[in-house]
A protein has these predicted regions:
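N-terminal basic, Ser/Thr-rich segments that initiate or prime the first beta/alpha elements at protein or domain
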Residues: 1-165
């Protein structure tokens, strides 16, 4: 039995055909001010040998961290970052309503900015730039270098396809 694919390469769809998801990531606790404070406290290295003040505080801060995590999952608060074959989108709520986005032709570089407290998670902010101008920011992205690399690779593919037409 043969199947006919709608695209020449499995999983690859031309941007002008339809928008498809490449990758979705959820912000860490490092996206929130309270989460960054928790990260800063847990990063304190003062101590003796294996034991540090930060590790002790990490144990004491488990309950507030869980509370912040549950808060981040509330329907009016939850967010996710969706990379498609056309743009990068911040989606809000349980249904993933597009809140704001940046098209691939609106930036030429992505910087990783690790704010105090985010390094403990490990997380960082992705700063999308067009020249020296910040055009978009994703807060508290987990393992930001991976998502940055995927965004840039997808952007290159999009712009390459657009130039060839």
């Amino acid at each position: 039995m043969s199947t006919v694919m709608k695209q020449p390469i499995a999983g690859v769809t031309a941007p002008e055909t339809r928008e498809v998801t490449v990758m979705t990531v959820w912000p860490t606790l490092g996206a929130y001010g309270a989460g960054r404070v928790i990260g800063q406290l847990c990063s304190i290295r003062a101590g003796v040998g294996f034991f540090s003040l930060g590790k002790l505080l990490a144990l004491l801060l488990i309950a507030p961290a869980i509370g912040l995590y549950v808060f981040s999952l509330l329907p009016g608060v939850t967010k996710r970052y969706r990379l498609t074959n056309r743009r990068v989108i911040v989606q809000a709520g349980l249904r993933g309503v597009d809140e704001r986005w940046v098209d691939f032709d609106r930036f030429d570089a992505i910087d990783v900015e690790v704010l105090p407290g985010q390094e403990w998670y490990p997380a960082g902010d992705l700063v999308f730039r067009n020249g020296q101008i910040e055009t978009f920011r994703l807060a508290g992205v987990s393992r930001p270098e991976t998502f940055r690399h995927t965004c840039l690779a997808t952007r290159r593919g999009y712009l390459g396809a657009a130039e060839s037409q």
